[in-house]
Each structure stands twice: as structure tokens, then as C-alpha cells.
Amino acid sequence: MSMSMGVRGLALRSVSKTLFSQGVRCPSMVIGARYMSSTPEKQTDPKAKANSIINAIPGNNILTKTGVLGTSAAAVIYAISNELYVINDESILLLTFLGFTGLVAKYLAPAYKDFADARMKKVSDVLNASRNKHVEAVKDRIDSVSQLQNVAETTKVLFDVSKETVELESEAFELKQKVELAHEAKAVLDSWVRYEASLRQLEQRQLAKSVISRVQSELGNPKFQEKVLQQSISEIEQLLSKLK
């Protein structure tokens, strides 16, 4: 039983090594094809690449990172040897997905970073422009308000002018009332004078009419006619006597 388990473990190790080597070769082939299809890039220093891989391992110093790496490798070997973890199709898919994700992260992350930086720069420019416009608007408002710093004196002068205007309007109204009153009094006096003149004319007409009627009545009286005749004869006789 132990021999069969050992054989099975060796078989699993060989299969895992084969799959791992195939999985490693596939990304290398993809990278090689990309390298051949595109312009040659500057090769990175192996030491710098190794340092970047080491820095990616969690830990504060080299001992901690080495312990984490060794523990992880021992755990993987132990899990595979004791059939706690069996490499199957899902594992291959997982490794392929992780390799593809790594490639995407390596080649698309810079482009996305550039896009994000450009977007952030655009938003930052818009915000800065809005802030500058707001600052200019505030400065213009401050300038417009500073021009009204003498508003108290101006208001006082305007109040004095309005007070003087009200006084002049009051005097003009009083003069207008006086003029209208004088016109009314003159109109009343004129009407009274016309009334008195009409009364005098009426009295004169009545007096003349009464005198004329009395004279006419006296002339129609025979005694008065005889008296007038006698008086006329006597006057004529006196004139004749004077002529002789």
C-alpha cells in the first residue's frame, strides 16, 4: 500500500512537473511571439527582476520572505505528495488564468494607468479652471463692493437732496394753493361786481320806467295839460312884453 502510494506520488510529481513546465513554456511562447511581433524592448536586468519578485513576497526582511517562500513550497509539496491536492483540469485552468491575468496586469496595467492619469488630469484641470473662475468671480465681487465704500456719504448727500426736494415741493404746493385761492377769490369778486352792476342796471331801468310812466300819466291828466298850457301862455306873454 505504501509502495503504491509512493508510486502514485512519483507519478503525480512527474505529471505536475510536466504540466508546470508546459504552463511555463506557454507564457514564454506568448511572450516570445509578442516580442517578435513588436519592436524590441529594452531587456530588464535579471537582478532587478529578481529583486522585484522578492519584493512581491510578503515580509519585512529577507529572512521573513525566505521563510514564507520555503513554507509555501513545502506546503505545496506536502499537499501534492499526500494527495491533499491533486492537479487536474481545474488546476490547469487556474494556472492558465493566473498566467493570463499576469500578462494582462503586465501589459494592460500601464495603458490603464496612463488612461487613469489622463482622466484624473482632465478632471483636475476642470476643477482647477472652475476654482480659478470662482476666485476671479469673488475678486470681481470684492472690487465691485469696494467701489461702494463711500456709500454712507453718498447716502447722506442723497438724503439731504431728497429733504430739500421735499421742502421745495411743499413750498410749491403752498404757492399753488395760494394762487388757486386768489383765482377763486377773484372769480367770486368778479361775480359779485357783475351781480351789483346787473342790480344797478335793473334799478336804473326800473327808475327810468317809473319816471317815464309817471310823466306819461301826468301828461295824460287834463289839469296838468291846462296848467302847462297856462304856464306856456304866460311865458309867451312875458317874452312879448319884453320885446315891446
From Swiss-Prot:
Its main location: mitochondrion. The modification Phosphoserine is found at S144. Transmembrane segments: none annotated. The keyword Ribosomal protein does not apply. It is found in: Mitochondrion; Mitochondrion inner membrane. Keywords: CF(0), Hydrogen ion transport, Ion transport, Membrane, Mitochondrion, Mitochondrion inner membrane, Phosphoprotein, Transit peptide, Transport. The keyword Transport applies. GO terms for molecular function: proton transmembrane transporter activity. Residues 1-35 form a transit peptide. It comes from the Eukaryota. GO terms for biological process: protein-containing complex assembly; proton motive force-driven ATP synthesis. One of its GO terms (cellular component) is mitochondrion. InterPro entries: ATP_synth_Bsub_B/MI25, ATP_synth_F0_suB. Pfam families: Mt_ATP-synt_B (PF05405). Present with 12900 molecules/cell in log phase SD medium. Mitochondrial membrane ATP synthase (F(1)F(0) ATP synthase or Complex V) produces ATP from ADP in the presence of a proton gradient across the membrane which is generated by electron transport complexes of the respiratory chain. F-type ATPases consist of two structural domains, F(1) - containing the extramembraneous catalytic core, and F(0) - containing the membrane proton channel, linked together by a central stalk and a peripheral stalk. During catalysis, ATP synthesis in the catalytic domain of F(1) is coupled via a rotary mechanism of the central stalk subunits to proton translocation. Belongs to the eukaryotic ATPase B chain family. F-type ATPases have 2 components, CF(1) - the catalytic core - and CF(0) - the membrane proton channel. In yeast, the dimeric form of ATP synthase consists of 17 polypeptides: alpha, beta, gamma, delta, epsilon, 4 (B), 5 (OSCP), 6 (A), 8, 9 (C), d, E (Tim11), f, g, h, i/j and k. This is ATP synthase subunit 4, mitochondrial. It comes from Saccharomyces cerevisiae (strain ATCC 204508 / S288c) (Baker's yeast).
